[in-house]
Amino acid sequence: MSQRVSDQAMAEVIAETRTNSSSRRHGGGDDTPSLPYMHKVGAPPKQTLFQEIKHSFNETFFPDKPFGNFKDQSGSRKFVLGLQYIFPILEWGRHYDLKKFRGDFIAGLTIASLCIPQDLAYAKLANLDPWYGLYSSFVAPLVYAFMGTSRDIAIGPVAVVSLLLGTLLSNEISNTKSHDYLRLAFTATFFAGVTQMLLGVCRLGFLIDFLSHAAIVGFMAGAAITIGLQQLKGLLGIKDFTKNSDIVSVMHSVWSNVHHGWNWETILIGLSFLIFLLITKYIAKKNKKLFWVSAISPMICVIVSTFFVYITRADKRGVTIVKHIKSGVNPSSANEIFFHGKYLGAGVRVGVVAGLVALTEAMAIGRTFAAMKDYSIDGNKEMVAMGTMNIVGSLTSCYVTTGSFSRSAVNYMAGCKTAVSNIVMAIVVLLTLLVITPLFKYTPNAVLASIIIAAVVNLVNIEAMVLLWKIDKFDFVACMGAFFGVIFKSVEIGLLIAVAISFAKILLQVTRPRTAVLGKLPGTSVYRNIQQYPKAEQIPGMLIIRVDSAIYFSNSNYIKERILRWLIDEGAQRTESELPEIQHLIVEMSPVTDIDTSGIHAFEELYKTLQKREVQLMLANPGPVVIEKLHASNLAELIGEDKIFLTVADAVATYGPKTAAF
């Protein structure tokens, strides 16, 4: 790194620095600077232990002050506000009118036409009978409409969570047709809801943010490909298909059945409707006004294919069909949940994982559409709403539900105004359960497979992956790790890799924070990173280091060693350039939001090491928390009060050469 000092003042600066620096050796504040600084670093008012704990608790769990409007209210008013807090529909419902209902009614009918065929297909991903998908789109949306805060999110089963649930449950009970498998699905749904509700009630929603965007992109893409590969069984009419989900096992199963297991009529039906679905998606993507074409196309596929199989009796020639679907509303499943026994632990494990993944997807969808309409959602209320609907769902024969991106997008484009669109959709699903389900008897499984493949195509976000590569290579590695983990091993392995890489990135950033050498921008008193601003000039006889992180036990030793390494490297370069040796080391602490006892100890060791090297340590702009701890630990006294400055410019003006001050 080359020394950046203006040429015209070089000789004068060197002479002055060598003359004056000998009288300014470090000494804990014994020397009197020639140019006093104008401002001292202020210390915050002293707080009691209780005040500190209260402040930290409120900032961690109640940063949005959710109960601020309860203050100074009567008891009856507080009761009303409490009900409105739990059930937001009681608040916005007061302003509901016919115009809003018109938009919600149209949107509800539109997403119902999309959700019914998807529900039949997604239930099969979870290794459940098709009617459980319909059950899940009846109860859960009703609960969410009363408790949720998003106007646009559409609730129901989704592909990724269905696949995750089916994979994890089949690992516990291989016979997916057994009654215990169904009971375990309800148990997992119950504990998924409990997990989500606890996160909301305890206001621990920030925990789901530990799964990075990059990991989610990779996981979703891998899950989409895995889901698509699983549908080859229905699309090709294969009866003897592997139970493994990795790409190697699936492709081996496909090719081993190529001569005897494929059914040409099934392939013709499946591919025809898949092409139709993809064409309608393309039309809707190119012309947003024609979104309804893509929305109703799955229902058209189900109706046309069912009629075709019925009149041709293709089921007699090897085309597999849905067969019987139960009619009627959801039966109670409260007695089916494992609250004890050998499957309780499995239900808790699967439920926690499925609940967190479902919650992550729902929050991402809710925030996306809220930003598009310029309103905000309450994350903790969303978690409570999601948890409640899954707990209630587990008691009414539903499996894990969450926000669906495809349905929410259609809901948004159809002009929904409030969550009432979910109520309209639920009513349509109820009518379907009561009246229409027998008509699905001849629906070919190949069409359901086509609907699933068309639905998950958009989950493979190539543009997002390319953007990750351009912006952050580590994020791209996280994305690819999750992606390959899903397609080559399993969904749970991919999810584990996604979480592990997300935590690894956090640990890497915490334990190895960035540091930078600062220089003065010509003609200003501003000091910036000399790598970012090549024209920035370093001050003769001084080294200015900025630490870009809080200083904790996990990184304090690294920061100390990195500062000393900067000192050695810069000192060697200045010696080679015959420039003044470094006599003052300034640590710019503006980005340092906090410091713990390990950080204090590291600075004490740094101070002692610099004393041996006859280099004077100075600090610039420590924040309120940091300066308070510096005084409490006596580190400020050790360094010297006159060595702690409000700005780098003050430190340079006080101890640097006069020509560098201006």
From Swiss-Prot:
Residues 1-35 are annotated as: Disordered. InterPro entries: S04_transporter_CS, SLC26A/SulP_dom, SLC26A/SulP_fam, STAS_dom, STAS_dom_sf. Residues 532-655 form the STAS domain. The lineage of its organism: Eukaryota, Viridiplantae, Streptophyta, Embryophyta, Tracheophyta. It is a multi-pass membrane protein. High-affinity H(+)/sulfate cotransporter that mediates the uptake of sulfate by plant roots from low concentrations of sulfate in the soil solution. The gene is ST2. Keywords: Membrane, Transmembrane, Transmembrane helix, Transport. Gene3D superfamilies: STAS domain (3.30.750.24). This is High affinity sulfate transporter 2.
